[in-house]
Amino acid sequence: MVEPSLAGLLGLMQLTDSALPTGAFSHSLGFETYMAAEQLEDRESFSAWLEMFVDQQLTHTDALAVRLVYAAGDFERVEDLDELVTAQALPRQIREGGTTMGRRLLSIGARSYPGEWVRRYQQGVEEERLRGHQATVWGVLARGLDVPEDTAVASHVYAAVISLTQNAVRGIPLGQNTGQAVIRAAQEWVGRAVATSRRLSEEGIAEEVLGAVAPGLEIAQMNHERQRARLFMS
């Protein structure tokens, strides 16, 4: 019998592993647009983009969404958040990618770590009442695993960082060792995302600022839809 605290950690490690088949390997979340413009060509330029993406997008979208799920008093609140978090993703590819990866995560999580909220979430998705955004799905799964809130936020943001860096390694391309150096450096940015989202949550304005993303990032993500040649789905 695995101790509860260890069980939660092991569940977290499984569900945030880059090998989890959610389809994250096929998304650049906008950095391919900068590649096409020859603005991402090496470690320095990709690191600058990734830091901005964490600070200006993930912090104010996914990180806050996870915290809002943790603060939810009932599942009806989660249903509202699922709709809200999906709607705030303005670029179509980002919105669709978030729900596609979220549904896959939910399917895997429901089989491995069933729970009341997980079951209701999956039922809502199957009935097309809920979207299944990845951030809210992860919030429900992490909460069910009794993962501490800050840890849930950090692991979700860091998983996105690792996935994007792995995609940049083969897309730009970067060397494998270079990719690992970027991932190590990104720990500081992940820490900022945790701290900033915690502060916004404690100030009671998490929902108010949810989706406050830098326009340049969203424009690049929208422009990706019209690129003539693409390696990634977003």
From Swiss-Prot:
InterPro entries to which the protein is assigned, alphabetical: UreF, UreF_sf
UniProt name for this protein: Urease accessory protein UreF
Cellular component aspect of the GO annotation: cytoplasm
Signal sequence extent: none
Function: Required for maturation of urease via the functional incorporation of the urease nickel metallocenter.
Main location: cytoplasm
PANTHER family noted in UniProt: UREASE ACCESSORY PROTEIN F
Keyword flag Transmembrane helix: no
Gene field: ureF
